[in-house]
Regions:
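A residue-level marker of the well-folded mature domains of exported/periplasmic proteins
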Residues: 40-344
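N-terminal secretory signal peptides
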Residues: 1-32, 36-38
Length: 344
């Protein structure tokens, strides 16, 4: 894994791959899905993850799938820690095994994943991706964690809680799905503390808690008294140095009751439930599922303040509630900014 291109983005031949899928694949999928409803039977769903189940991002997919399984809607199997070089093989094995919906994240194998989808037109694929779906491959839909709404609101809280007006931010890679959350958080901070300084770092990994922790230590040494924990390991550093942290995707306050002030939560259930319904109805098609992560769709929220309920100023909580209401009713829209955030 020597570069971001090899890890999160496919090779720059995506257009050629999708063009190769062509109209023939489109007809095959229409023939496979049209009129083939699965409403009266459990849907066979498989998932392929490149990281452990407990990793923040993937844990939300795994949780949503298990919730659907517990409801009796699906049969669910999953494989974790699949390398990019093995990903295509595992996709094919799950398709051959009769699974009708395959879930995963293909940021490092964009082209290969689409090739597999082309070869299995009767199988629906719902994949985390940096790219948009293409009508030439109608059985391949994409999603991402568009939780900028919740990230913005946690930024408002962070801006009120930092005393030094110096915030450290540790991310995995400077790519859209990370950048948009960081930028939304920074915008929220500036809403209440416009002069705040930001230290922004990326560790070049999706799961390296020791490296994230060391990076966070350096930011604390640089004056940060609050950390944006986009990666595991950051809150450990905050706890050891007695500074505050803002969580991302999952709520870890139970593990860090004196450290994690607030967290932006991702709820994957609306995304997955829509896909399940579409496959069962025989109407699955190429679609951008990103919108189902928006707050107004129930795709994200702020975790309860819990141990910090009495520590966050009342006027700040009121401001957050006001903005949350505006986001949900559509009168306020958080900007989606995928540009790489910079230190200030």
């Amino acid at each position: 894994m020597s570069s971001i291109a090899n890890i999160r983005f496919g090779a720059p031949t995506r257009r050629n791959i999708l063009k190769a899928a062509g109209a023939g694949a489109a007809l095959g999928v229409l023939g496979g899905f049209a009129g083939r409803a699965f409403a009266q039977e459990k849907l066979k769903v498989a998932a392929i993850y490149t990281v452990p189940f407990e990793q923040q991002w993937v844990s939300r997919l795994h949780k949503a799938a298990n919730t659907a399984k517990d409801r009796g809607d699906i049969d669910y199997v999953a494989t974790e820690n699949v390398s990019n070089t093995d990903y295509e093989r595992v996709m094919r094995e799950y398709a051959e095994a009769g699974n009708k919906l395959i879930l995963g994240e293909v940021f490092g194998v964009e082209d290969a994943a689409r090739t597999v989808a082309k070869d299995y037109p009767d199988v629906a694929f719902l994949m985390g991706s940096s790219f948009k779906p293409d009508a030439a491959l109608p059985n391949f839909s994409t999603f991402d964690n568009y939780i900028q709404d919740a990230s913005y609101l946690t930024g408002i809280i962070a801006g009120a809680m930092t005393r030094s007006k110096n915030i450290g931010m540790v991310g995995g890679y400077p790519i859209p799905e990370v950048n948009r959350l960081m930028n939304a958080f920074m915008a929220g901070v500036k809403e209440v503390a416009p002069d705040t300084k930001f230290q922004v770092s990326f560790i070049g990994s999706w799961f390296d808690p020791p490296k994230a922790k060391e990076t966070a230590f350096a930011q604390i040494d640089g004056g940060a008294d609050l950390l944006y924990a986009e990666r595991f390991g950051v809150s450990d550093a905050a706890k050891e140095k007695s500074v505050l942290a803002i969580g991302n995707v999952i709520d870890t306050q139970a593990d860090y009751p004196d450290t994690v002030v607030a967290s932006a939560l991702w709820h994957f259930e609306p995304t997955l439930d829509h896909a399940i319904a579409q496959v069962k109805a025989g109407t699955f098609k190429a679609e951008d599922y990103g919108v189902y992560s928006f707050m107004k769709e129930g795709g994200c929220s702020i975790a309860p303040l819990g141990t910090f309920e009495g520590k966050v100023p009342d006027d700040v909580k009121a401001k957050v509630a006001e903005k949350e209401k505006a986001i949900k009713d559509g009168s306020f829209t958080v900007e989606i900014n995928d540009a790489e955030p910079k230190s200030s």
